[in-house]
């Protein structure tokens, strides 16, 4: 009995140890998986079957037609020309990599810390053992100050001047003197946007040309340019040589005619049937009034797959021919819809560009008015006093400024009269 009981105890202990080991293995495996999957990565964009992973959207100018690419949502209205590669900074912690959502700007290897100004009237109330906590916090502050160097903390109320931002405009001079407003009116962002929009319009116009050529293939036209050699026109003597020069150029004409006859014999051999039919119908046709004889383009047949090419179309069954015709019709409809959408997109871009240019023109006029109001000369151009007074009067008439403007006009007019009289006195003396 003792042997059997000891064997049972050993078996139970071994089973417990095995279960413990299995539970440890499972727990470590789950922790490992959780650590590897805990990174805040975005889900990759894949195809419907999940086999194809779309590439990254690097070097694209717009997300039109590129929305399936990775990180295509980063392309914003503010930065249309996104030619820079989108490389994200990552940090490794907790067993996996994480994307950095925000980076702190470090200057002179020192870290700036922001503290909120506490209310002076409110005194802190200590409860329990908060004295020890304050002591430990002071020690931590000393450690951080020693580590980051002796630098004063930045006060949040001093970093942002709310009063300066929310102060209304009293005159046109505030557009130049007010820092926040002058930064807005002197920014070239509207000009850059207009330039980027016109570049996008040119790019979309090229795609419109390609779609148009593709539709011409479905209509049976020639998508490529048509040259004189493809028109199959009969030979015609234009009589461009003078009678005096004919004798000197007879030998050259004979040689050229021989070469031309050789070329025409090769090219017109395949067209003899068409020409004979035309001659039978219309009789003798003047080569000067002859119409070009163009054959139907074979560009559509070249686009078909090899199994259903021009040589084997006749061997297809009725079901295969019907399926092929449906595919051709669907491709034509889709290309026509794409062409219409592309033209509509170009029209919308043109409207947007007109609005942006108009806003930029108004911004420039307001900025120039404010410069003239303050008497700031552009490019060393001096404005006469009388003209300056008239302009300031017109500008002030359209604004709400009512402060001692008449006195300023009188003073400037007196100065202007004195300045204008000086040259006359010198002229009288002379």
Curated annotation (Swiss-Prot):
Chief location bin: nucleus
Signal peptide location: none
Top-level lineage group: Eukaryota
One annotated GO biological process: nucleosome assembly
Quaternary context: Component of the RPD3C(L) complex composed of at least ASH1, CTI6, DEP1, PHO23, RPD3, RXT2, RXT3, SAP30, SDS3, SIN3, UME1 and UME6.
Miscellaneous comment as given in the Swiss-Prot or TrEMBL entry: Present with 1630 molecules/cell in log phase SD medium.
Role of this protein: Component of the RPD3C(L) histone deacetylase complex (HDAC) responsible for the deacetylation of lysine residues on the N-terminal part of the core histones (H2A, H2B, H3 and H4). Histone deacetylation gives a tag for epigenetic repression and plays an important role in transcriptional regulation, cell cycle progression and developmental events.
Name of the protein described by the UniProt record: Transcriptional regulatory protein RXT2
Organism: Saccharomyces cerevisiae (strain ATCC 204508 / S288c) (Baker's yeast)
């Amino acid at each position: 009995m003792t042997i059997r009981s000891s064997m049972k105890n050993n078996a139970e202990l071994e089973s417990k140890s095995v279960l413990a080991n299995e539970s440890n293995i499972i727990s470590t495996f789950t922790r490992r998986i959780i650590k590897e999957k805990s990174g805040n990565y975005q889900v990759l964009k894949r195809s419907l079957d999940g086999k194809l992973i779309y590439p990254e959207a690097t070097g694209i100018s717009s997300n039109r037609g590129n929305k399936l690419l990775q990180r295509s949502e980063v392309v914003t209205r503010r930065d249309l020309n996104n030619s820079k590669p989108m490389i994200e900074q990552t940090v490794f912690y907790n067993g996996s990599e994480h994307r950095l959502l925000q980076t702190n700007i470090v200057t002179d290897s020192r870290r700036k810390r922001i503290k909120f100004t506490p209310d002076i009237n409110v005194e802190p109330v200590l409860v329990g053992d908060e004295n020890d906590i304050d002591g430990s916090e002071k020690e931590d502050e000393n450690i951080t100050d020693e580590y980051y160097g002796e630098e004063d903390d930045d006060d949040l109320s001093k970093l942002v001047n709310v009063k300066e931002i929310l102060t209304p405009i009293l005159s046109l001079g505030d557009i130049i003197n007010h820092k926040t407003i002058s930064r807005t009116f002197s920014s070239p962002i509207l000009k850059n946007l207009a330039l980027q929009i016109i570049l996008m319009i040119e790019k979309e116009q090229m795609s419109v040309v390609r779609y148009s050529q593709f539709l011409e293939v479905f209509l049976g036209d020639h998508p490529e340019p048509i040259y004189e050699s493809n028109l199959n026109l009969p030979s015609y003597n234009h009589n461009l040589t003078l009678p005096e020069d004919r004798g000197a150029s007879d030998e050259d004409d004979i040689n050229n005619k021989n070469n031309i006859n050789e070329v025409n014999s090769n090219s017109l051999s395949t067209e003899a049937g068409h020409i004979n039919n035309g001659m039978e119908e219309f009789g003798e046709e003047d080569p000067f009034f002859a119409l070009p004889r163009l054959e139907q383009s074979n560009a559509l047949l070249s686009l078909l797959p090899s199994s259903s090419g021009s040589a084997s179309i006749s061997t297809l069954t009725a079901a295969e021919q019907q399926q092929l015709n449906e595919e051709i019709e669907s491709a034509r409809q889709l290309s026509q819809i794409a062409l219409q959408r592309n033209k509509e997109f170009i029209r919308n871009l043109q409207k947007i560009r007109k609005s942006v240019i108009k806003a930029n023109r108004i911004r420039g006029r307001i900025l120039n008015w404010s410069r003239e109001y303050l008497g700031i000369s552009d490019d060393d151009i001096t404005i006469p006093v009388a003209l300056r007074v008239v302009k300031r009067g017109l500008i002030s008439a359209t604004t709400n400024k009512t402060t001692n403007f008449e006195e300023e006009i009188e003073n400037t007019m007196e100065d202007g009269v004195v300045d204008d009289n000086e040259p006359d006195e010198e002229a009288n003396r002379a």
